[in-house]
């Protein structure tokens, strides 16, 4: 029975990759620009994202080791939802967007490496260690494909409707 559960984890991760990395908010720079942010402010917001990510990558990995992969994945989705809500609520307020970017970085940090580690451990426990690279490649393909799909879908919203992409992001995060 446990082996089936570990095999199930691998399949579930494909669904998680699909919904969690849809890429629907890929036009966030245009969104911020449409909401009154200058290029300088957008660059600063990007810096906040990457600085937060740099500072929190190792601590977020320690949380996964301390608690569980599942907990980190839940935290990732919750942070993604909160970040999207803040982006919608920002209405041109730099500081709200800054908080949203920091929380978005945490969302990526909580997922970064956690999915791969969970899939690897599940493959080992299910007796599929020798197939891990092909499983990992498949999941990477799902992730890349859905990011591309999300970008194409977001393209339909670029003329003043980019806020809808954050609602879609919230919905897909809830599904996950």
Give the ranges of each region predicted by the language model.
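Residue-level signature of mid-helix packing/kink "hotspots" within the transmembrane helices
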Residues: 50-58, 144-148, 152
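Cytoplasmic helix-loop-helix junction between adjacent transmembrane helices
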Residues: 101-143
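C-terminal ends and interior cores of transmembrane alpha-helices
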Residues: 78-92, 97-98
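Helix-to-loop junctions at the C-terminal end of transmembrane segments
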Residues: 56-68, 158
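Helix-loop boundary and gating motifs at the non-cytosolic
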Residues: 2-55
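Transmembrane alpha-helix termini and helix-breaking/packing motifs in multi-pass membrane transporters
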Residues: 34, 87-88, 147-169
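Helical-face signature of the major facilitator-like transporter fold
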Residues: 13-21, 92-105
């Amino acid at each position: 029975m446990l082996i089936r559960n570990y095999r199930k984890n691998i399949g579930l991760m494909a669904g998680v990759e699909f919904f969690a990395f849809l890429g629907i908010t890929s036009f966030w720079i245009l969104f911020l620009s449409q909401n009154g942010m200058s290029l300088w402010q957008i660059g600063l917001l990007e810096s906040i994202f990457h600085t937060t990510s740099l500072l929190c990558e190792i601590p977020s990995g320690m949380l996964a080791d301390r608690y569980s992969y599942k907990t980190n994945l839940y935290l990732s989705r919750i942070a993604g939802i909160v970040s999207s809500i803040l982006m919608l609520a920002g209405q041109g307020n730099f500081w709200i967007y800054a908080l949203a970017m920091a929380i978005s970085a945490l969302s990526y940090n909580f997922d970064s490496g956690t999915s791969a580690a969970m899939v690897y451990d599940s493959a080992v426990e299910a007796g599929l260690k020798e197939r891990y690279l092909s499983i990992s490649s498949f999941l990477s393909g799902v992730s890349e494909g859905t990011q591309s799909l999300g970008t194409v879908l977001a393209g339909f919203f670029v003329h003043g409707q980019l806020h809808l992409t954050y609602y879609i992001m919230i919905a897909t995060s809830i599904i996950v």
